[in-house]
């Protein structure tokens, strides 16, 4: 009988599916890795807090409490006001002043926790890391450490991108003034006229010299006649 048997041929064999390929884990940047560690540290702090504290009830005062708690793990020497090395950036000898968290480290930590709080789905308006009390506390820590360590903290100014201006045009070539050109032309004309006059006087002198020589050879009458002819006749006949 066909169809009566329930053997292996009549049953649908399940298709063996290949296991899903494991997607390579995206490597986090150094900032993202540090932000995740800081966030886990803060959540662990809330868990160990006495009395117990939830993230929803956390305020700016609790954040300041957390920052003071981290001071015990600090590595920055902050001199007390009565220390002999107060205000010296490089003390010559060790002192019993406590180690604290540096202001720069705390400021960067708050920035990462503020971003992690909002990335976890919480509203920015309820962000305890952005509270005004936290900003005031960080400012006080900065000023106190600057005086105690003798290292002023200067806020870095962002460099503004300056618009590239075209280079200035080259200076125009020097132009001759009309008066100067006229003066040069007149001086050139005067020089030319003086040269012509000099040539004329030279020719006259040469002619006179030649006449004198001719007269000397034939007798004194020629010289006298030439001189008389050359001199103007101003006398009037009576």
UniProtKB/Swiss-Prot annotation:
Sequence motif Nuclear localization signal, residues: 155-159
Region: Disordered, residue numbers: 1-33, 147-238
GO biological process: mRNA transcription; post-embryonic plant morphogenesis; response to light stimulus
ALOG domain ranges (all copies): 30-157
Ribosomal protein in keyword set: no
Domain of life assignment: Eukaryota
Keywords, alphabetical: Developmental protein, DNA-binding, Nucleus, Transcription, Transcription regulation
Bias-annotated ranges (Low complexity): 10-27, 177-213, 222-238
GO cellular component: nucleus
Bias (Pro residues): 165-176
Gene Ontology molecular function terms on file: DNA binding
Family: Belongs to the plant homeotic and developmental regulators ALOG protein family.
Protein name: Protein G1-like8
Organism of this sequence: Oryza sativa subsp. japonica (Rice)
Organismal lineage: Eukaryota, Viridiplantae, Streptophyta, Embryophyta, Tracheophyta
